[in-house]
Amino acid sequence: MKVQQEAVNVLERTSAYLKSGILKKTPAWYNVIAKVPPTKKFARTPQLTHPMNGKSRTALPDYSNWKANSSGLYKTRPNSLEKKDGASKLYQSPKLVYIEDKLRKLFFQQHPWELSRPKILVENTLETQEYDWSHIQQLGKPLDGESVVQRTLFLLKSGEKKELIDAYDQARFEFYRLRIQQEIQDQVAQEEAEMFGSVFHTTSIEYGIAKEQKVIDTWKRKALQQAELMAARASSPSASWTNETEEEQKPIDQDVEEIQL
């Protein structure tokens, strides 16, 4: 079956329509497609080198320095399965790895509670290149894990720190100092407000937890009663029928409390 390639000629066809006057108005996508035209090569070509680090993707492991296994045998060459895996990777898209992603993963693994802080979607649209990362605190941007990442990269690019771990530690310690300062300021502001008569009610999360705890307590009380009933039934089957009859006479919704949100 012949590969259909008419869709990739949309730029040339639209240009001809504009030139001949068939189209009076330039489409909104015209300039974008002109800057990044679609590819016309549909043949899969093997990528022998990785585009990120330039390493060969066909190189097999060197077994010359390998030690003997438990049987006392040495492995001197790759087997057919290893050769097959190496050949199949030539046509796969290489994974793009950025140092920023590694720093973000490390930071949030060490500080998982930073993910629980509220965040608005507008913060993701801010360009980090507009800020001066010679200091970690920025005007108009909240202090978060991304500040640590960008501060670390600035220390590496400026030459203040030559090692990645040293730059990350310095940015992390600056983050700790500012975070402690913010928490102290919030605590002092709350104490001053309470001193002047302000009353802080429970938050939505605390209110939900309290309602949930009431349901859990009701369930626990019923579970204990059911466990006692089963134990009594196992020890004295004749007496258990009397208790069971009394339990059936009770209204079903006696211990159920309506949760008003």
Curated annotation (Swiss-Prot):
It comes from Kluyveromyces lactis (strain ATCC 8585 / CBS 2359 / DSM 70799 / NBRC 1267 / NRRL Y-1140 / WM37). Component of the mitochondrial small ribosomal subunit. The gene is RSM25. Belongs to the mitochondrion-specific ribosomal protein mS23 family. The keyword Ribonucleoprotein applies. It is found in: Mitochondrion. The keyword Lyase does not apply. Residues 233-261 are annotated as: Disordered. It comes from the Eukaryota. This is Small ribosomal subunit protein mS23. Keywords: Mitochondrion, Ribonucleoprotein, Ribosomal protein. One of its GO terms (cellular component) is mitochondrial small ribosomal subunit. Its main location: mitochondrion. GO terms for molecular function: structural constituent of ribosome. Signal peptide: none annotated.
